[in-house]
Amino acid sequence: MNETNEWSRLSRRRQQKKKRKGRITFILIFLFAIIAIVGTYYASKINHTINLITQGVGNRTEQEANEIIKNAKPINVLLLGIDNGAYGRTEEDGRSDTMLLLTINPTQKKSQLLSIPRDTYTEIVGAKIYDKLNHAYAYGKATMVINSVEKLFDTAIDFYVQINMEGLIEFVDAVGGIEVTSPLTFNYENRTFIEGKTELIDGESALRFARMRYDDPDGDYGRQKRQRIVIEKLVEKLMSFSSITNFEQLMNAVSKNVKTDVPIGQVMALKNTYSPALTSENLSQAFMDERQLLLKNNEGQEVYYSYATDEVLLKTSNSIRKLLEKSAVKTYPLLQQREDLYYLTIP
């Protein structure tokens, strides 16, 4: 890809970001919906599934986490969409291709969803290197992503929720398929989608719809947009109990493809206390104003990264701190000393 085409694509992405409206965040609501749709009738099966998906990964003890939720404190939740399997990668070299930081203040009934560019050039905490942020998962799974995001924004992550994209097939089939309207015409792996055409698709087609990247003029942003469409349609189906055609299949898909460190006994309390702040009226979208950075990697290849100045990081950190009811900081504590590493920037 030449520099002109890359710059044109990046410009389109910036313009489209400004047009996006606030929505109910999809990954956390997806987890909540799975639990809420079935009520107490399937309580034992749900509890078994929750036991399978909850894992102690973050930097909070279970007692601390319980107190946070019990006292309705403002929280940060890191939402990760992992590409294990779905894009030809293994568990060892997977990437967190979708990273969202959700800050929720249940008392104010306000929340902010920060989209973190996957190519953000930053320190990978624990690996002693600088790289794209989405590579942190390959180096040290969710723990390293959490630690790297905490340092990048100078804020604590209270909980995380992770969904593997390879589970899309099972999720979609379990609800009897979903209706999607393609934003563009394309063919991927012998499956054709027509711009503006609404159709009912199964799990295999949903995965093809969500994973195509290189034929989209908007590149990775276009792929993320289609992933949002699929997940939002899944949520719509999950909110209607009658839409679930195979409950056992759904629970199996959840246990294999969803992970979180929310304490088992607090999942429903988290939903009941914090979800009112997640409506479209109460949720604001936030984006980082980043420059593009061209570096040579360890193999001497030229690679594009997203680069946030300390001023941008300060502004972003303070927007998070405000919702957490913490004092703003005037100078950013993170000195990354990256300026001597690059030889070309696109302002």
Enumerate the language-model features and the residues they cover.
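Extracytoplasmic/secreted envelope proteins and their assembly/folding machinery
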Residues: 96-98, 130, 142-150, 165-169, ...
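Extracytoplasmic
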Residues: 72-75, 94-99, 108-116, 128, ...
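Second-shell loop/turn segments in exported
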Residues: 86-90, 130-139, 154-159, 214-221, ...
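Amphipathic, coiled-coil-like alpha-helical scaffolding segments used for oligomerization/assembly
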Residues: 134-193, 241, 261-263
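Flexible, solvent-exposed short loops/turns enriched in glycine
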Residues: 112-140, 184, 191-198
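Entry/capping segment at the start of metal-dependent catalytic domains
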Residues: 2-8, 16-109, 290, 304
